């Protein structure tokens, strides 16, 4: 297809074109681009394509700042100026709430953009692999590398291939320096990188966590099958400790399984502490190697402030915090509430929530672990009291119908619904509409250069 004009943005960071009533989804283009398209997949009502030639570039186009753009699979909206990114995210929220929710809405507040659009993440995970991914350009030029080992990110659709990352713009540059130093040391001393198909090799993954307190955690994960490999591994860790004295938590994990999950594995301290801290309004949140914490610390604070403001707390309320995670929101609003009860599926997260309450001398929170639809029942409410306010922050799939039914039974005065998926949020708002009216909507951009958007909605009992 020749000289097709890109019309709009779509889900998953792609853009839309239309040819003879056929809707076409195209990645890495922006509205206003005029391109030739090559169809990759065709369905009855839509097709997926890629741009193979640009005839005109949109005036609303930015130059990508990352050398890995278009290959690593992340930051797909680098080609859009940030002002355009947040405009489309605002539109995404409005479209979802109106098209799917079909409910009466107030005026939607302007999106809260991120002050940082680069180096805004506090956590990144990198993968080692003995199969370096070669870009199309490298293949065309028949580039030969002395090293086919790589450390970086998985290529979308090719789990055993890893794109060698020289510089990632998502996390503080210390992350790049540590990763590249480990890579170079491993090259120089002939360490083996994992083969993701056969599971042979030593170095597997590394995780870097930074924090607003200036603390720095590095976790190196390896496979050890022979005794001498442990000695080699500790030599690598000593090199990291000597080279980067600013690391406050240098940890390691032995993973001899066939998958990369670490939740069921022991974490060992090589140097420093087994945790770092995040801070927010004088509260300290302990973050361990397996802990969940919002990956954009500064915007997380803004998000939580919106949730607290919408909750309208005076100090007398019983608050339920559903899908509480490690209890960050629950502990954050506890000073303005009579009591906060947090419920979360993951037992380890609930233990973190209790620890964080103890660290901050918070005595008016209770935390329970269990599946939400099994925990939040009429009996639970009869036992613990009817909530005045419910704050809910469910996963992308939204809330289970049973959970919504119990919320309707409980009839809190206000519901604050925090969502990372405005589409499922809109569906749930429609289900709550029989008793609740939407009073305020506040989108928040947590992830610049991606299509993801958070949205906070205040509902009040009719």
Model region roles, listed by residue range:
Residues 208, 214-223, 284-288:
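Short, aliphatic-rich beta-strand segments
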Residues 53-63, 73-192, 226:
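Extended interfacial segments that mediate partner engagement and assembly in macromolecular machines
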Residues 109-116, 196, 203-205, 443-446:
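Short, solvent-exposed loop/turn elements at beta->coil junctions and helix N-caps
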Residues 15-20, 152-155, 219-221, 353:
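Short, acidic/hydrophobic/Gly-rich beta-strand patch recurrent on exposed beta strands
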Residues 118-122, 212-214, 451-452:
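A short, glycine/Asx- and small/polar-enriched loop/turn
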Residues 3, 11-13, 227-462:
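Rossmann-like S-adenosyl-L-methionine
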Residues 1-68, 366-367, 374:
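Terminal RNA-binding accessory module
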